[in-house]
């Protein structure tokens, strides 16, 4: 029954995407079918097949080791505020977001910059990009951008495509925006992991977002023009660093900007949510609903969707609330509110944890529309009106991609 419900959830999400398509007659069944199959296959390999699960666990172990090295840098600056004594001192509540999550973002961004400098990222992107381009029958630039999102976030995508943005057709531009929204950056992945989100789920979600973003981008905005961009004129950065030290320093400064942005937005939105909840609770109290909140309203509205994705009805309100928070606010706030349930064993079953972890794993939220429009318009001011028109539709495609990954994850966890 649970497995069939997951299948129903996939059908519902695909139906929603089909209904939102701007040109239903131009939908390529070859690309859409291949993307769906690839998204399912990646999920199956990493969540169900023993060899794939073994690899995911080993990579997750490696990520945790990297986080430990990040803590070494944090401890140098903040001392014992990062150490295990904090948990003892505060009875298990010694995890401080600003001392653990934000420094990890800075460290990983610097590390990624070094890997770009020595050519590792370039090789991975070209190999994976070529594979996805052939498998999905998409343009080279679409596969390039989609694969790049494993390592870079939506803020960095405009810089990646700047050298050839004038040659991107409307569909390729839409796909680039969708891919950025549907994914997470490698640096922020560490931040989510630090909150207790299973790393193997984050890794699987990041890989599944590649075909998932393409799938829903091509459903909502089918390709109607041929590509004018080739791999021969692709570049990873406009001004590459001249040394590995410069690469590390530049990456660290970029990480600082990302960390500062995360801290600023999370702090502001947590406070805004508290204000909204105070207002809702106050008004609700007049009618006997003094415990009403934004989270509870979103939970009721999205609970049916969470249920059809595979979440048990007893947890559907919570799942719907977190998905709503991610969409209305951002994924960091949603993961932050999800974190307490991860810290207490047995609070949620494994399938629910997986579905929520996958559903929240992406930049798709209303605030991202402003980020994308601003970032892409900065590198292509003359295309700003076109980019603004694509924003809301791209958000829908990216959200559906995240929910599809979550539904697929629930399907395979249910089989295990």
Swiss-Prot record:
GO terms for cellular component: plasma membrane. The chain crosses the membrane at residues 3-23, 32-52, 96-118, 173-193, 197-217, 247-267, 353-373, 395-415. Residues 24-31, 119-172, 218-246, 374-394 are cytoplasmic. GO terms for molecular function: nucleoside transmembrane transporter activity; symporter activity. One of its GO terms (biological process) is nucleoside transmembrane transport. Signal peptide: none annotated. Keywords: Cell inner membrane, Cell membrane, Membrane, Transmembrane, Transmembrane helix, Transport. It is found in: Cell inner membrane. It is a multi-pass membrane protein. It comes from the Bacteria. Residues 1-2, 53-95, 194-196, 268-352, 416 are periplasmic. Disulfide bonds: none annotated. NCBIfam families: nupC. Belongs to the concentrative nucleoside transporter (CNT) (TC 2.A.41) family. This is Putative nucleoside permease NupX. It comes from Escherichia coli (strain K12). The lineage of its organism: Bacteria, Pseudomonadati, Pseudomonadota, Gammaproteobacteria, Enterobacterales.
């Amino acid at each position: 029954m649970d497995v069939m419900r997951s299948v129903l959830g996939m059908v519902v999400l695909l139906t929603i995407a089909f209904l939102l398509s701007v040109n239903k007659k131009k939908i390529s069944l070859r690309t859409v079918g291949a993307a769906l199959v690839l998204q399912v296959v990646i999920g199956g390999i990493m969540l169900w097949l023993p060899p794939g699960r073994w690899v995911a666990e080993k990579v997750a172990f490696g990520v945790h080791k990297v986080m430990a090295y990040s803590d070494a840098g944090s401890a140098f600056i903040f001392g014992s505020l990062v150490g295990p004594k904090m948990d003892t001192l505060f009875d298990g509540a010694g995890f401080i977001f600003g001392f653990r999550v934000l420094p990890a973002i800075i460290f990983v961004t610097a590390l990624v910059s070094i890997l770009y400098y020595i050519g590792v990222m370039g090789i991975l992107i070209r190999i994976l990009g070529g594979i996805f381009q052939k498998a999905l029958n998409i343009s080279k630039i679409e596969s390039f951008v989609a694969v790049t999102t494993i390592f870079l976030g939506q803020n960095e995508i405009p810089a990646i495509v700047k050298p050839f943005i004038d040659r991107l057709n409307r569909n390729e531009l839409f796909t680039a925006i969708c891919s950025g929204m549907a994914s997470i950056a490698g640096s922020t992945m560490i931040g989510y992991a630090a909150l207790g989100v299973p790393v193997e789920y984050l890794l699987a979600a990041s890989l599944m977002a590649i075909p998932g973003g393409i799938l829903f981008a091509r459903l909502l905005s089918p390709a109607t023009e041929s590509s004018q961009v080739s791999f021969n004129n692709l570049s990873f950065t406009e001004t590459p660093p001249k040394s590995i030290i410069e690469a590390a320093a530049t990456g660290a400064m970029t990480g600082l900007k990302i960390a500062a942005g995360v801290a600023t937005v999370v702090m502001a939105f947590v406070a805004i949510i508290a204000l909204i909840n105070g207002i809702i609770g106050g008004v609700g109290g007049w009618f006997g609903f003094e415990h009403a909140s934004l989270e509870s309203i979103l939970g009721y509205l999205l609970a049916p969707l969470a249920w059809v994705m595979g979440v048990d009805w007893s947890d559907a309100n919570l799942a719907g609330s977190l998905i709503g928070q991610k969409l209305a606010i951002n994924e960091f706030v949603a993961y932050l509110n999800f974190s307490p349930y991860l810290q207490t064993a047995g609070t949620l079953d494994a399938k629910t944890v997986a579905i929520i972890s996958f559903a929240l794993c992406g930049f798709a939220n209303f605030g991202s529309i402003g980020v994308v429009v601003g970032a892409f318009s900065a590198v292509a001011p003359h295309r700003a009106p076109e980019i603004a028109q694509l924003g809301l539709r791209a958000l829908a495609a990216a959200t559906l991609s995240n929910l599809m990954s979550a539904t697929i994850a629930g399907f395979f966890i249910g089989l295990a």
